[in-house]
């Protein structure tokens, strides 16, 4: 006589699936690099941005990536203009 036993083995550990999360891009360090009233040298970055959140004023240049930089050495001055726009200028001292 032959007996066939139907044995079934169950997992002793739960199977762990992979996830598609768990990565992020490096931060771009955008924002103000010089604050109002602070001294800056010519060529120094004043504000890093995407688009023109802050507009260039007197003695301030705008780079290809919309970064604002000082054209001369002086004091940084942020000012409101228009309805809801801001510009940054460098005042020579």
UniProtKB/Swiss-Prot annotation:
Matching Pfam families: Ribosomal_L27 (PF01016)
Q: Which GO terms describe its molecular function?
A: structural constituent of ribosome
Q: Which gene encodes it?
A: rpmA
The family annotation for this protein states: Belongs to the bacterial ribosomal protein bL27 family.
Positions annotated as propeptide: 1-10
Give the residue ranges for region: Disordered.
14-36
Keyword entries, A-Z: Ribonucleoprotein, Ribosomal protein
* Name under which the protein is recorded: Large ribosomal subunit protein bL27
The source organism is Mycoplasma capricolum subsp. capricolum (strain California kid / ATCC 27343 / NCTC 10154)
Question: Spans of biased composition, class Basic and acidic residues?
Answer: 21-36
**GO CC aspect terms:** cytosolic large ribosomal subunit
One GO-annotated biological process of the protein: translation
The record describes its post-translational modification as:
The N-terminus is cleaved by ribosomal processing cysteine protease Prp.
Question: Which PROSITE patterns did the record assign?
Answer: RIBOSOMAL_L27
């Amino acid at each position: 006589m032959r007996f066939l036993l139907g044995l079934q083995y169950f997992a002793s550990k739960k199977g762990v699936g992979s996830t598609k999360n768990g990565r992020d891009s490096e931060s771009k360090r955008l924002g103000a690099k010089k604050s109002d009233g602070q001294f800056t040298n010519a060529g120094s970055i004043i504000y890093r941005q995407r688009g023109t959140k802050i507009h260039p004023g007197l003695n301030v240049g705008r780079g290809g990536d919309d970064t604002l930089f000082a054209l001369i050495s002086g004091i940084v001055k942020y000012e409101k203009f228009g309805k809801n726009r801001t510009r940054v200028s460098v005042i020579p001292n």
